[in-house]
């Protein structure tokens, strides 16, 4: 007698259910996707006990006649795929034809459906994979599927189910994902008779995103839409002012299908680099569209993962689209424009968009410490040409006075240039007044750090970081671990603008450093850089890590808290901030600016 034999169909379906039916939420996903493929415009989902007692999905789609209803319960029977060529370009949500029979094999299953011809429909009942009653039923066009007593015949599976409240949460998340994918379709979800989600058809993606992400996130949503090659990325992303503790609030869809893709999520996170605090994640709803034959959706039992023909193309499209939207988004209000005589402000009180300043204003960004080495170092720096820098503790280009004549360079236009500088508080914060009486508080270290980081990053991308050579090398001694990492990463250090070489033991002779970092404590800076390089693998990961390395350099060079800043220096900083992107956050994600409106101030002191 042969030891190998063909399994009976019922057991085959139960094995398939182990892949397709992970929990009640999996059933909801499969049935709702079938409804969407059937052209439904309204879908209702009802669950009891988290879906373990009942899952009901009703739709107004195309429905089926008696013959198709019976065929739909056969394994690998489908209307969505006919040949191998179709498998290479799948445009429907489902295509394998195994979900419905798998679900029916582990539940008490009932299907009511009608194609809408004279109200005549068909009812099919199945219990544990065994066909029961097949009878006519009167009903409107569409399909209703009821799944009761899930895993009643496979108690080993049922004992692994979580509490009903946990399973209900998974069902809710599954419906939210499907509702986000199709704002043109109405969705309702009831759990235990209580309405959990009601999303009307045609309300728009912003409304759906607000329901999924919450009211606070809805306030910070920004539109994104761009195409790179064959890949289009569009949707909504929250500004850095709203972030999440995990990455679960970032919904990614590929050709309308929700997917989990680490590389795609990393592309979005990388676009937010320097705008979010450590450990925080972006939120949003993003759609990736590309030709069907450029993505394989047949790689995961629940179709939650996909494989791209050109993964780098998708990564770049996501990164550049999101980064571009963040760069151009109005994090802060634009500078109010004076209205012509006889005209009031723009309707609705909306700010007028003002383009960022160009290269003239960008010259202000080279605000750095005086070019002098630490005492006792024995190093001497090449000094800039006389008159190019102001004297004093901090050096920065002096803008021409307002009455300097017709050749005077125009002041930058923008939010910060429109502020009136009031003074410094606690030797850490710059206090300014905005038009309308709003009090603006600026963190002097965070803002200067962002400005220096911007300049370093732009110079790094262009491979032309200005280097200040030392007349005599400066010798620094580092901790052993940092010294080893720095010696292994001398090539990367050179790309950052440092000219250094080993000098025996844990010492290095530094012959030059980036000009923007003149006067910093090289030992402390190189120790930090060495610690970061120790965590970086050679190769492509180094490029990702350069953001952190440049941020560290900017942090060491920026003006500190508890440090005096003159009005001229404060004004130069304000003018320079308008010429850079991501001005509302430092490279480590901390806020740069805080506003207190006059109305809020008056409420706090009892004037309102």
Curated annotation (Swiss-Prot):
Single GO MF annotation: ATP-dependent DNA damage sensor activity
Protein name: DNA mismatch repair protein MutL
Biological role: This protein is involved in the repair of mismatches in DNA. It is required for dam-dependent methyl-directed DNA mismatch repair. May act as a 'molecular matchmaker', a protein that promotes the formation of a stable complex between two or more DNA-binding proteins in an ATP-dependent manner without itself being part of a final effector complex.
Source species taxonomy: Bacteria, Pseudomonadati, Myxococcota, Myxococcia, Myxococcales
Keyword Transmembrane attached: no
Biological processes per GO annotation: mismatch repair
Gene: mutL
Record-level GO cellular component terms: mismatch repair complex
Matching InterPro entries: DNA_mismatch_repair_MutL, DNA_mismatch_S5_2-like, HATPase_C_sf, MutL/Mlh/PMS, MutL/Mlh/Pms-like, MutL_C, MutL_C_dimsub, MutL_C_regsub
Domain of life of the source: Bacteria
Similarity comment: Belongs to the DNA mismatch repair MutL/HexB family.
Species whose genome carries this gene: Anaeromyxobacter dehalogenans (strain 2CP-C)
Key words, A-Z: DNA damage, DNA repair
């Amino acid at each position: 007698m042969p030891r190998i034999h063909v399994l009976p169909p019922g057991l085959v379906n139960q094995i398939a259910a182990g892949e397709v039916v992970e929990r009640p939420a999996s059933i909801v996903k499969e049935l709702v996707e079938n409804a969407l493929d059937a052209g439904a415009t309204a879908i209702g989902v009802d669950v009891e006990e988290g879906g373990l007692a009942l899952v009901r999905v009703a739709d107004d789609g195309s429905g089926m006649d008696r013959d198709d209803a019976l065929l739909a319960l056969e394994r690998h029977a489908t209307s969505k795929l006919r040949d191998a060529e179709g498998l290479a370009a799948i445009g429907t949500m489902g295509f394998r034809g195994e979900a419905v029979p798998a679900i029916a094999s582990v539940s008490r299953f009932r299907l009511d459906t009608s194609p809408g011809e004279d109200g005549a429909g068909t009812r099919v009942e199945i219990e544990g994979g065994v066909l029961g009653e097949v009878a006519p039923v009167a009903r409107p066009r569409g399909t209703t599927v009821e799944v009761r007593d899930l895993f009643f015949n496979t108690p080993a599976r049922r004992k692994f189910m979580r509490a009903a409240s946990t399973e209900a949460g998974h069902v809710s998340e599954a419906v939210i994902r499907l509702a986000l994918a199709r704002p043109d379709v109405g969705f309702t979800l009831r759990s235990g008779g209580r309405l959990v989600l009601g999303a009307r058809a045609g309300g728009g993606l912003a409304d759906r995103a607000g329901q999924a992400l919450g009211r606070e996130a809805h306030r910070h949503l920004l539109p994104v839409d761009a195409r790179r090659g064959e890949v289009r990325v569009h949707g909504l992303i929250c500004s850095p002012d709203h972030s999440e503790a995990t990455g679960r609030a970032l919904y990614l869809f590929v050709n309308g299908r929700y997917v989990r893709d680490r590389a795609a999520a990393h592309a979005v996170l990388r676009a937010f680099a320097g705008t979010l605090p450590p450990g925080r994640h972006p939120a949003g709803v993003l759609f990736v569209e590309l030709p069907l034959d450029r993505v394989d959706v047949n790689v995961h039992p629940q179709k939650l993962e996909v494989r791209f023909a050109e993964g780098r193309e998708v990564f770049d499209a996501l990164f550049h689209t999101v980064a571009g939207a963040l760069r151009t988004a109005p994090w802060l209000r634009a500078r109010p424009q004076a209205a012509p005589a006889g005209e009031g402000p723009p309707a609705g009180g909306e700010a007028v968009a003002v383009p960022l300043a160009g290269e003239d204003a960008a010259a202000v960004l080279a605000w750095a410490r005086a070019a002098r080495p630490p005492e006792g170092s024995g190093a001497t720096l090449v000094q800039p040409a006389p008159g190019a820098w102001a004297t004093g503790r901090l050096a920065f280009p002096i803008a021409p006075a307002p009455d300097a004549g017709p050749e005077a360079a125009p002041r930058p236009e923008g939010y910060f240039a429109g502020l009136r500088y009031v003074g410094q508080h606690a030797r850490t914060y710059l206090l300014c007044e905005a038009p309308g009486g709003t009090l603006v508080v600026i963190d002097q270290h965070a803002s200067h750090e962002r400005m220096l980081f911007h300049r370093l990053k732009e110079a790094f991308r262009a491979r032309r970081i200005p280097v200040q050579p030392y007349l005599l090398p400066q010798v620094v001694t580092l901790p052993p671990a940092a010294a080893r990492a720095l010696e292994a990463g001398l090539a990367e250090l050179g790309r950052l603008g440092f000219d250094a070489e080993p000098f025996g033991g844990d010492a290095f002779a530094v012959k030059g450093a980036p000009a923007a970092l003149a006067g910093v404590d090289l030992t402390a800076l190189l120790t930090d850089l060495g610690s970061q390089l120790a965590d970086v693998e050679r190769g492509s990961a180094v490029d990702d890590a350069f953001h952190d390395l440049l941020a560290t350099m900017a942090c060491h060079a920026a003006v500190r808290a508890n440090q005096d800043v003159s009005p001229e220096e404060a004004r130069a900083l304000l003018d320079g901030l308008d010429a850079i992107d991501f001005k509302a956050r430092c490279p480590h994600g901390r806020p740069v600016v805080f506003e207190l409106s006059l109305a809020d101030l008056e409420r706090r002191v009892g004037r309102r």
